[in-house]
């Protein structure tokens, strides 16, 4: 028996060690993952890096369940985290960055919001109602005890005065309905207090503009995210454009290079030059669906993000030749998103995923679909 117990004890200790090691390993991986999210951004010096990370930790992700911008892996937290890092790199103070974030999302984004009377009222109102309920219950119980004493004294006096009967004294029978009615009254009071305790704070909370502020900030982040997806860094594009131009000088009849040059011009907001490049590609290889879709995108942004007749015509031609044309579906999803047609935008993005086209940036599409889901839940009145 002793040997069996020893074996069991050693086995239990070994299991504990294994669990501890696995926990430590997972914790180490989590730290590494968190550090990796920070290290991908190159700061000018270590002090800026430390300040940026601490500042990002003090800001709440608008989309997550009580996670800061460093802890969260959501797309909006990633974008906000990079925005904080860039503003720190530009030399902006912590207060300037916090003011910009709160102006967009409200005080919800700040883990340490400034004191405001409406916030204090929101937190103190349930406490005040609890205290009020406790006071009312205390006086109600005291009144009940006093009434019971009076009734008991009255019954005692009546028993002394009146003769006992076979069925008991009549005063005791008269006292019972009174107790039942008082019990019903007390139950109603408790129910009313409990209802008020829940209804008043909830009504006041939903009367605040916190959710609408967060939703507006989320919408602005969606628009900014779309622009970041469409437009890359200007200086980087200048180098790409120069390389492509040199390549075309040696081989001007390469349609694929003309397409790449057009995309680089679009990313650099040079839409006129992009349309010239797409036109040259079309002359060399014909009116292919991808060329038409890229040209429609350039025309759309050239017109100030307006759906002109020419843009619509090019989109229809591209999708008639290839219903899963990537640039056309991406543009239609962007237009639907800007018009707050989230369900329609989601359908276009899902079509991109289902197309199986290798040119589709699946990670970017999935991130946009998650944002669409968040916005749809927001329009339905659900808490972000």
Curated annotation (Swiss-Prot):
Residues 180-384 are annotated as: NrfG. It holds the Pfam family CcmH. PROSITE patterns: TPR, TPR_REGION. It comes from the Bacteria. GO terms for cellular component: periplasmic space; plasma membrane. Heme binds at residues 61, 64. Belongs to the CcmH/CycL/Ccl2/NrfF family. This is Formate-dependent nitrite reductase complex bifunctional subunit NrfFG.
